[in-house]
Design a protein with these regions (language model features):
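Bacterial N-terminal signal peptides
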Residues: 13-26
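Extended, histidine- and acidic-residue-enriched regions that form the cofactor-binding/catalytic faces
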Residues: 29-91, 95-104, 108-114, 121-139, ...
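N-terminal secretory signal peptides that target proteins for export/translocation
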Residues: 1-11
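Sequence-pattern detector for short linear motifs
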Residues: 6, 14-17, 254
Length: 299
């Protein structure tokens, strides 16, 4: 009889461990969804999501000349990161925010020019709407040097007005930590969002002889990207490199390597840790800072 109980006890212990292990796996994995794109979900699906979480990733881009890539490549890059981040952290993605400040690339006729002061109110209106809808954890993503001129005022002013600490991540800094090749990441990004064929194979770009600005490099190094001094590129070919023909096989290989670099960047980023840090920071603000200093803080 004791052997029977011993056998039963061992089996019960194994079953219990398996159950606990399965529960931990489920807890660590984000729930499956039909899509993470808010614009592809029904209102019912969005409201069901908001019952369990409040995280949304907002890729913000620009449309500009960029060598052999489509002009929206610096929107597609953050979009791919947002999609993967949302899958990892159980968030949603708000797409289609592609038209913001490009910087000095306005010399290319494919560049759409919106100033930071024009883009900021639009983003702030979206942020307010998202907060009212229930998205308190808003994470804005860019991969474009001049973007901080629009996004940094957004997160600072929105926090002062609402006391909701939304976050801005410039993906370039994270990619550098992961030693990622920026061009290959773009190939990978188009693959992630299902648009790899949008990168052309047989485009050749020629840059005409033109003078270079003798003082620009010294001056631009004195401040943040495009924020130290106003300037324009001397030729569209100076931004993104010159387009060169590639084969379909090369494009597929670059995309494969780029996706791996995106994944490596996300590992460095620790997306779940970022979201938890936002919750901790928000709680500290609400529980400690506001009760102590609320009467003198900006309204």
């Amino acid at each position: 009889m004791s052997k029977v109980f011993a056998t039963f006890g061992a089996r019960f212990a194994r079953l219990t461990l398996c159950t606990i292990g399965f529960a931990l796996i489920c807890w660590c994995q984000a729930p499956q969804m039909r899509t993470r794109y808010l614009t592809s979900l029904t209102n019912t699906e969005i409201e069901e999501y908001l019952k369990r979480n409040d995280v949304i990733f907002i890729p913000v881009g620009n449309v500009e000349v960029h060598g052999g890539f489509p002009t929206d490549c610096e929107y597609v890059g953050p979009l791919a990161f947002a999609q993967k981040m949302a899958e990892e952290a159980d968030g949603l993605v708000l797409p289609n925010l592609a038209y913001f400040f490009p910087g000095g690339t306005v010399v290319g006729k494919g560049t759409i020019y919106i100033t930071p002061s024009e883009g900021l109110p639009y983003l702030k209106a979206i942020a307010r709407s998202l907060l009212r809808q229930g998205f308190r954890r808003q994470i804005y993503l860019t991969d474009h040097g001049p973007s901080p001129q629009t996004l940094s005022p957004l997160v600072r002013e929105f926090f002062d007005e609402t006391k909701d600490p939304i976050l801005y991540i410039e993906m370039g800094s994270l990619m550098r930590k992961a030693h990622a090749d920026f061009n290959k990441v773009l190939f990978g990004a188009y693959s992630v969002v299902g648009r790899l064929d949008d990168i052309p194979l047989n485009v050749t770009q020629v840059m005409q002889e033109h003078p270079s600005d003798p003082g620009l490099n010294k001056l631009q190094a004195l401040g943040p990207g495009s924020g130290a001094i106003g300037a324009y590129f001397g030729d569209p070919g100076e931004h993104g490199g010159l387009a060169k023909p590639i084969t379909a096989e090369q494009r597929a290989q670059f995309a494969k390597e780029g996706v791996a670099m995106i994944d490596a960047t996300l590992k460095v980023a620790d997306v779940k840790g970022i979201v938890q840090a936002m919750r901790d920071h928000d709680k500290f603000t609400q529980d400690v800072i506001l009760p102590k200093y609320g009467n003198i803080l900006p309204k």
